């Protein structure tokens, strides 16, 4: 019995020290959709669990896209709201799982994406500021938003 404890104690200690991931959900999908398109009366799913068309009284307001990228080690869930022509209307962080680097949820950092299109550089160090201490998170969110801006052309 003592040898069993001696063998498993280091593993148990390592798990305890590592601790659980730091996951914080800031917004649900429904909350993010409503923030992106407050006047929308209906969200129609265009692509299962990923893309919705927002409309009000039959008028298309834009598209809401949910995506997920890796931060440094763990996923970041975010959304991009697009105008009908593909211009970025809003970006939100829905869930951040890393223990640090959550500055990517800062409204001032996310506001940099507003008005950008597929023709914009959308590159950290160019038209998007890097975040010290969240370099990989800011890089990967920016790459994800750029991918969605390119995808927006297929939504018209």
Regions found by a protein language model. Name each.
Residues 1-9:
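Bacterial N-terminal signal peptides that target proteins for export
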């Amino acid at each position: 019995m003592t040898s069993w404890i001696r063998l498993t104690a280091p593993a148990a200690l390592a798990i305890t020290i590592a601790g659980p991931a730091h996951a914080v959900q800031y917004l649900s999908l429904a909350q993010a959709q409503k923030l992106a398109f407050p006047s929308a009366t209906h969200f129609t799913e265009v692509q299962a669990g990923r893309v919705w068309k927002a409309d009000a009284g039959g008028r298309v307001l834009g598209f809401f896209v949910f995506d997920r990228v890796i931060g440094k080690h763990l996923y970041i869930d975010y959304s991009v709201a697009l105008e009908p022509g593909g211009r970025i209307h809003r970006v939100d962080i829905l869930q951040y799982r890393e223990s640090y680097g959550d500055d990517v949820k800062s409204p001032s950092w996310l506001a940099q994406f507003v008005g950008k299109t597929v023709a914009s550089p959308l590159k950290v160090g160019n038209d998007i500021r890097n975040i010290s201490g969240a370099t990989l998170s800011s890089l990967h969110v920016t790459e994800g938003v750029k991918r969605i801006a390119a995808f927006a052309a297929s939504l018209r």
